[in-house]
């Protein structure tokens, strides 16, 4: 029997025993397809992720220091999922979800599925059941640090429980991974940072829950606070920096910078001004910003106010930025080709280099 016939016989036997689709060539029509995504709700982050959003059927880890904007990122993703007609679930192990803030970010709180589990085992079992149902598009677990093993809860304060949480996460992720891929569900774990004791060289920071999540995650995002945004003498928000430290679906190590305004969420207008000026969609001369030869404001704050009031121009600028930076997802209406130097939208950055250093 030739090699080809032996292989076809083996493939046929595998399909017969385990079902159609259990094994296939990567070039087969059933296997070859673009990755489905859920937009992050932040243009700069969609670009940094390389595919226009979070990949479905994968595990994502978002980690960072306290009050750095981790939960905000997940709520924005939930809002985007719901806008597309999807169903979202939030496993609130920290018991700290603020419905008012979620609503402010665009989340349909009436249709958001929420669970506040008592133990880590219960939280992960609920997440697994939601994933296996196939009826949920995104599941957020907030947070890994709050997934307390049952043995620790039932034990006395001060008892030592070495490695319990790491074992729990390792076991759960082994079980979850195949179901997540099969149901094409996006699962986001929020994680916290801890300090490793006795580290003299290198980064002493690490995440909770052992190493399993680091391996199983297709994308890992590190969230950091930047400088303060001031309205006069009052602090009205923070600059946020998100670094893609691991990415299995696109080139990693890109960074997204944006503004988080207290009580409002992410400032879309600030993002459009920054990206528009960077790629010459918005002209900047001194302190003045202009769009298509028309001055829109002196200074960033005035320009933000203008875009808030003039939604048609804001949407036009947003579309131009998306067509330039994510041409595969948002094709140019005027041309099938990606914008080049000297075209209608001119860029200061060489397009060949752009995809490696966009943000």
UniProtKB/Swiss-Prot annotation:
A single GO BP: DNA repair
Chain sites annotated for binding ATP: 64-71
Localization: Cytoplasm
GO molecular function list: ATP binding; ATP hydrolysis activity; ATP-dependent DNA damage sensor activity; damaged DNA binding; single-stranded DNA binding
Composition bias, Basic and acidic residues: 331-344
GO CC annotations on file: cytosol
Keywords: ATP-binding, Cytoplasm, DNA damage, DNA recombination, DNA repair, DNA-binding, Nucleotide-binding, SOS response
Pfam families, A to Z: RecA (PF00154), RecA_C (PF21096)
Keyword Iron assigned: no
HAMAP family associated with the record: RecA
Known role: Can catalyze the hydrolysis of ATP in the presence of single-stranded DNA, the ATP-dependent uptake of single-stranded DNA by duplex DNA, and the ATP-dependent hybridization of homologous single-stranded DNAs. It interacts with LexA causing its activation and leading to its autocatalytic cleavage.
Protein family (similarity comment): Belongs to the RecA family.
Name of the protein this chain belongs to: Protein RecA
Native organism: Francisella tularensis subsp. novicida (strain U112)
């Amino acid at each position: 029997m030739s090699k080809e016939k032996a292989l076809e016989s083996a493939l046929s036997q595998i399909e017969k025993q385990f079902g159609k689709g259990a094994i296939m060539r990567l070039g087969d029509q059933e296997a070859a397809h673009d990755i489905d995504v859920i937009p992050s709700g932040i243009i700069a982050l969609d670009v940094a992720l390389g595919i226009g959003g979070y990949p479905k059927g994968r595990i994502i880890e978002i980690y960072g220091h306290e009050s750095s904007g981790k939960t905000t990122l997940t709520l924005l993703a939930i809002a985007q999922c719901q806008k597309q007609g999807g169903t979202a679930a939030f496993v609130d192990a920290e018991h700290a979800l603020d419905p008012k803030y979620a609503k402010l970010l665009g989340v349909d709180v009436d249709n958001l599925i929420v669970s506040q589990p008592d133990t880590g085992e219960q939280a992960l079992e609920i997440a697994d059941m939601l994933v296996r149902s196939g009826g949920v598009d995104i599941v957020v677990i907030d947070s890994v640090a709050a997934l307390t093993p049952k043995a620790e809860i039932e034990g006395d304060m001060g008892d030592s429980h070495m490695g319990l949480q790491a074992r729990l996460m390792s076991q759960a992720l082994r079980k979850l991974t195949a179901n997540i891929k099969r149901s094409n569900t996006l699962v986001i774990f929020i994680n916290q940072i801890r300090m490793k004791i006795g580290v003299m060289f290198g980064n002493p920071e690490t995440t909770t829950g052992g190493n399993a999540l680091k391996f199983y995650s297709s994308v890992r995002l590190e969230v950091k606070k930047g400088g303060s945004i001031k309205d006069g003498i009052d602090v009205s928000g923070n600059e946020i920096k998100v670094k893609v430290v691991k990415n299995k679906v696109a080139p990693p190590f890109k960074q997204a910078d944006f503004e988080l305004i207290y009580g409002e969420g992410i400032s879309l207008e600030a993002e459009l001004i920054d990206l528009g000026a960077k790629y010459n969609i918005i002209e900047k001369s001194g302190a003045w910003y202009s769009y298509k030869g028309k001055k829109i404001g002196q200074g960033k704050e005035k320009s933000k106010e203008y875009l808030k009031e003039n939604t048609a121009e804001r949407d036009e600028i947003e579309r131009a930025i998306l067509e330039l930076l994510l041409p595969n997802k948002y094709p140019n209406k005027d041309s099938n080709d990606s914008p080049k130097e000297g075209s209608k939208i001119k860029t200061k950055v060489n397009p060949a280099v752009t995809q490696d250093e966009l943000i």
